[in-house]
Amino acid sequence: MSTKSYDYLIKLLLIGDSGVGKSCLLLRFSEDSFTPSFITTIGIDFKIRTIELDGKRIKLQIWDTAGQERFRTITTAYYRGAMGILLLYDVTDKKSFDNVRTWFSNVEQHASENVYKILIGNKCDCEDQRQVSFEQGQALADELGVKFLEASAKTNVNVDEAFFTLAREIKKQKIDAENEFSNQANNVDLGNDRTVKRCC
């Protein structure tokens, strides 16, 4: 019997307008590389990275969705099962920021009720081209009730932090809560003295 190389699997989703840097952010996080050339994601792509949190190995399965309107119907199916969602906009593109509410509305409509969300203002290294201030980003995050970070895939600012913040919240609320429930169930079921061995 093969043993799993991780303790928990968490599915994350990257959403936002086309060109905001979703693929670049994912590439930086999963492979620590950056490409300046813009390649449009067709439909869906995903990458995997296993991280360690509180002594547990967490396998992150991160789905990169196409931002173009014609792919919206394809991507809605991928909201299901997602435990965390990164909503991205480009700080140099006000329109992508204005569209965050539409993306958020899609999440509310299609994702599970208690999915965790974080708002990311990408390309914060392009200070001279900035159209959206940090304060505007924070104000929108406060309005939507989500955490907020500015990041740069190019200069590797807050990239790990974005994914780790989301993973930490999910682990704390969902996985630890499940373990608590499981422990309570085990305490009640005193008649069952079987020893269950878990693979790690």
Swiss-Prot record:
Coarse class of the protein's main subcellular location: membrane
Signal sequence residues: none
Binding-site list for GTP: 16-23, 64-68, 122-125
Intervals of motif Effector region: 38-46
GO MF entries: GTP binding; GTPase activity
Membrane topology according to the record: Lipid-anchor
One GO BP annotation of this record: exocytosis
SMART domains according to UniProt: RAB, RAN, RAS, RHO
S-geranylgeranyl cysteine lipid attachment residues: C199, C200
Keyword vocabulary terms for this entry: Cell membrane, GTP-binding, Lipoprotein, Membrane, Nucleotide-binding, Prenylation, Protein transport, Transport
Superkingdom: Eukaryota
Entry GO CC: cytosol; endosome; meiotic spindle pole body; nucleus; plasma membrane; prospore membrane
SUPFAM superfamilies membership: P-loop containing nucleoside triphosphate hydrolases (SSF52540)
Compartments (UniProt record): Cell membrane
Function: Protein transport. Probably involved in vesicular traffic.
Entry's family note: Belongs to the small GTPase superfamily. Rab family.
PANTHER family in the record: LD44762P (PTHR47980)
Note: This protein is essential for cell viability.
Record-given protein name: GTP-binding protein ypt2
Organism annotation: Schizosaccharomyces pombe (strain 972 / ATCC 24843) (Fission yeast)
Recorded name of the encoding gene: ypt2
